[in-house]
Design a protein with these regions (language model features):
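Short beta-strand/loop element within the Bergerat-fold HATPase_c
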Residues: 37-45
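Intrinsic-disorder/low-complexity, polar/charged segments enriched in Ser/Thr/Lys/Arg/Asp/Glu/Gln
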Residues: 44-48, 132-134
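N-terminal assembly/transducer modules of large multi-domain enzymes
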Residues: 2-36, 92-95, 99-271
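Flexible ATP-lid and adjacent glycine-rich G1/G2 motifs of the Bergerat
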Residues: 46-109
């Protein structure tokens, strides 16, 4: 049985392997935090992502359909479908084991759409129903997975003494994270003139997980440092000293309150 998603071959044409894997991993992590244990395994050049006791409806193949809430990483409802498309388009076969069915996404010409190439999910009934939702992504080598894995902080955790954590998010102080922006543990972008790396607990992103505007970024930077400055003003001061054009410094000039200004003044006097 073929389930035609109606999604054209070139939809989200700038998505590739990273975006495809990201969507499956973020969905798995959301389910993990809801009590459905996630596992990640690389075996015979296949990345295998599983969640315990999960079955999703076929309606999940419709654009805009989502079971995720506001607090989840994937909010726009398109990740499953667009992730499939990106991976298959890039030459990575995908198999999904979902309850009593096996889904195999492919790109095919659709007669009902005048021969347009679209994403089709071929559905086959399994002999034995599975309780775990499992995604198998083919042609993922060790080097590729190592590079991708490093973009998920919940899979490749930073060293504790190289981080500062608050209710707003985490500052990543290791040089390897400089300029790296994460949201809920998933890499978003490498940003010029960031003196450190950051993992925010929440931030408005678009469908492609891009920062909506620079103002939001600067506001978040100020929020996280406001929450940390009393205990770690010396570290903030060192970060600001790295560059006179950093986003941290720009945000500070716009949003710093008197307490933050006083704490930094104390560090300046020490110097």
């Amino acid at each position: 049985m073929a389930l035609n998603t109606g999604i054209r071959y070139n939809y989200a044409s700038d998505w590739g392997v990273w975006e495809g894997v990201r969507e499956f991993v973020q969905n798995a992590q959301d389910a993990h935090e809801d009590g459905h244990k996630a596992t990640y395994e690389l075996k015979n050049n296949c990345l295998i992502i599983s969640n315990k006791n999960v079955v999703i409806p076929s309606a999940a193949l419709l654009l805009g359909y989502s079971v995720n809430g506001r607090s989840a990483r994937g909010r726009h409802g398109d990740g499953l479908k667009t992730g499939m498309l990106a991976l298959v388009r890039a030459g990575h076969a995908v198999e999904i084991y979902n309850g009593e069915n096996k889904w195999t996404p492919e790109i095919e010409a659709a007669e009902e759409y005048g021969g347009e190439r679209v994403l089709v999910v071929n559905q086959r009934k399994l002999r034995v129903t599975r309780t775990d939702f499992t995604v198998v992504i083919h042609n993922i080598g060790e080097g590729v997975w190592a590079a991708l894995r490093a973009r998920f902080l919940f899979l490749d955790k930073p060293i504790d003494f190289e981080t500062l954590t608050s209710s707003i998010g985490t500052v990543l102080l290791a040089p390897s994270y400089e300029g790296c922006l994460f949201v809920k543990g998933i890499f978003v972008a490498k940003i010029k003139d960031l003196a450190a790396g950051y993992d925010f607990n929440d931030m408005d992103l678009d469908r492609d997980r891009r920062v909506v505007d620079s103002w939001s970024l600067r506001y978040k930077l100020n929020e996280v440092w406001q929450s940390l400055v009393q205990q770690h003003g010396d570290i903030l001061y060192r970060q600001l000293r790295k560059s006179d054009s950093s986003h941290e410094l720009h945000g500070l000039s716009n949003y710093a309150d008197s307490g933050l200004a006083k704490r930094l003044q104390q560090e300046l006097i020490k110097e």
